[in-house]
Regions:
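Contiguous, often N-terminal, cationic amphipathic patches that form binding interfaces
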Residues: 1-59, 63-68, 78, 82-88, ...
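The alpha-helix within a helix-turn-helix
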Residues: 71
């Protein structure tokens, strides 16, 4: 895991702008001892936020926990965060609805915090 890099080894950020949203990529570890976004990691398919949740990966519980964690982490309403890919995979893509430029700034600030 890259504790502070804003980009993976490919030189890309773990998010991109969409239509009135940002699409962010996460590598999820369920059944963890805590709920946390811990940094940026290179997954081989590109960079992703390394994320842990306490929820188990059954009946969508870990996916729901990830959506709630990301909403809280970014300070956005829960309804603005939705899983769009990776329902049964560790690699997830979330759509975060809102002003893409503002969300980009929030995500970059969070990545910068990993460097401290």
């Amino acid at each position: 895991m890259t504790g502070g890099a804003a980009v993976g080894s490919s030189g890309r950020k773990p998010w991109r702008h969409g239509d009135a949203c940002v699409i962010a990529h996460f590598r999820l570890t369920p059944k963890s001892s805590k709920d946390a976004v811990e940094g940026v990691t290179d997954t081989g398919d590109g960079p992703a936020f390394q994320t842990r949740v306490r929820a188990v990966p059954e009946n969508g519980a870990a996916n729901t926990a990830l959506e709630e964690l990301v909403a809280s982490w970014l300070g956005v309403p829960k309804r603005s965060v939705s899983l769009i890919a990776g329902g049964k995979s560790r690699l997830k893509s979330l759509r975060i609805a809102g002003e893409a430029t503002l969300l980009d700034q929030k995500l970059q600030m969070k990545v910068d915090e990993f460097q401290r």
